[in-house]
C-alpha cells in the first residue's frame, strides 16, 4: 500500500495491499480498507468505515477470485462519516458522506450525501 505524507491512521485499522491514501488524510479507528481502494488527499475516513470490493455478483463470495472484485476511487477533500459502507464506486472531490450511509452508486457532484442508499441532501 501507499500512504502519503502527514497522514494519520488510527488503531485497529486494516489496510490491505495495493491501497493508496493521499497526503494529509486521516483514517479513524476500526476502519477496513480493502484492496483496489484509492483515497485522495485531505480526506477524512470516520471510525468503523467499511470499503467493499466484492459485490457477491453471482450470489456468493468471490472466494479470492480477484476478477470478480471492483475498484473504489475517492477524490480529494472527501469526508466519510463513522460506520458508513462504501461499495465499489467513484466519489468526486468535495463530498461529505453522512455517518451510517451506504454508498451504492457513483457520486459525480460535490455536496452532502446520506442514507441507505446514500442520496444527495444538499449542495455546499
Where are these regions (language model features)?
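Flexible, glycine/small-residue-enriched loop-and-beta-strand segment within the central core
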Residues: 1-91, 117, 124
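C-terminal/domain-terminus segments
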Residues: 94-103, 112
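Conserved beta-to-alpha transition
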Residues: 108-109, 124
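Acidic, glycine-centered active-site loop in nucleotide-sugar glycosyltransferases
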Residues: 109, 114-117
